[in-house]
Amino acid sequence: MAGAASALFLLDIKGRVLVWRDYRGDVTAAQAERFFTKLIETEGDSQSNDPVAYDNGVTYMFVQHSNIYLMIASRQNCNAASLLFFLHRVVDVFKHYFEELEEESLRDNFVVVYELLDEMMDFGYPQFTEARILSEFIKTDAYRMEVTQRPPMAVTNSVSWRSEGLKFKKNEVFLDVIESVNILVNSNGQIVRSDVVGALKMRTYLSGMPECKLGLNDRILLEAQGRAIKGKAIDLEDIKFHQCVRLARFENDRTISFIPPDGSFDLMTYRLSTQVKPLIWVEAHIERHSRSRVEMLVKARSQFKDRSYATSVEIELPVPTDAYNPDVRTSLGSAAYAPEKDALVWKIQYFYGNKEHTLKADFHLPSIAAEEATPERKAPIRVKFEIPKFIVSGIQVRYLKIIEKSGYQAHPWVRYITMAGEYELRLM
């Protein structure tokens, strides 16, 4: 069998991801950016009309329709002609459903789009591409989706992610709203990359076949419905749901309704691309007092509210590769020299909001280290931390209801955590 598609992307004319579906888990959303960069690089070349491109182990096949790019990324030795034909069939199906395949129609019907992509391709292999067949399963009416009546669950095994007959002495649900902050600051102190990747992670210990309903705060719900809101809206992108979520219900009233799997799973993932203020800012100054002695002064400042605090803070500060015998003093926490990393690691257990702490260090260098010595490394400052009870996006769980026919009482637990993702400051 020919190689399969890894993922399918729908991009706007500027290369921004509108919708993407990951089929095999061997590529990431970053493939869209690499594809569009490749597309721009070849613009004007004799091969610029080639619908197939290859870069760093990934083959890209694409077609353009109106202001939309439909692109398949594959890490396998795939049949490009077959997948290009499939993309044209996808265009035909979308036109059947939405009349015009435009950016607006995709945004207004993203739940329908995901349903169609799931029916048309399975694990990267094309399945149903006839609009008439798909219409038997998925119907639309004025941008609203209606899923036709299906056979009972026992016949279709539509709850394949959950076994029947589960029993627990204590019925509990744990929901963690976790956001990872990615920051890259250049040597001039400018933020060159900033985004937040979020996930609603669940652990369920529930008997029977429970029905769960999760409601998020109004700033997300109202924005999704295109209505006026008060205060700053939460503009989430690249939203992906676990297969247990009833997408039709979410499309109708923005309620996340589902029968959960047993154990741990990601209910929902998302991304926030608006620029985020660095939660912990670090400045470092290095001064050479002689050919054999270097002094380092570091200031770390928390830039979040007083009532919050960061825990397990770890600041990795690069030092000259030939440094030895450090003398370190900190206003808070402890620091240790890690020669295997050529770094000084500063650890702070609790770092409260709107506070500044300092580190001073003296390093000795070999006496032969003069101006002719090896140039200093330009490694970045790396920061790790966790901030409990704090979320950058402002997303909040309004309610989490668990209903099961036996009528037992379940205990839901919700917590919020913000942590450092790829958090680097190239200031040294």
UniProtKB/Swiss-Prot annotation:
The GO annotation for biological process reads: intracellular protein transport; vesicle-mediated transport
Give the record's membrane topology: Peripheral membrane protein
Domain of life where this protein originates: Eukaryota
Which of UniProt's keywords are assigned here? Cytoplasmic vesicle, Golgi apparatus, Membrane, Protein transport, Transport
Q: Which residues form the MHD domain?
A: 170-426
Please summarize what the entry says happens upon disruption of the gene. Growth retardation phenotype.
User: Known SUPFAM superfamilies for this protein?
Assistant: Second domain of Mu2 adaptin subunit (ap50) of ap2 adaptor, SNARE-like
Where, subcellularly, is it found?
A: Golgi apparatus; Cytoplasmic vesicle, Clathrin-coated vesicle membrane
- Provide the protein name: AP-1 complex subunit mu-1
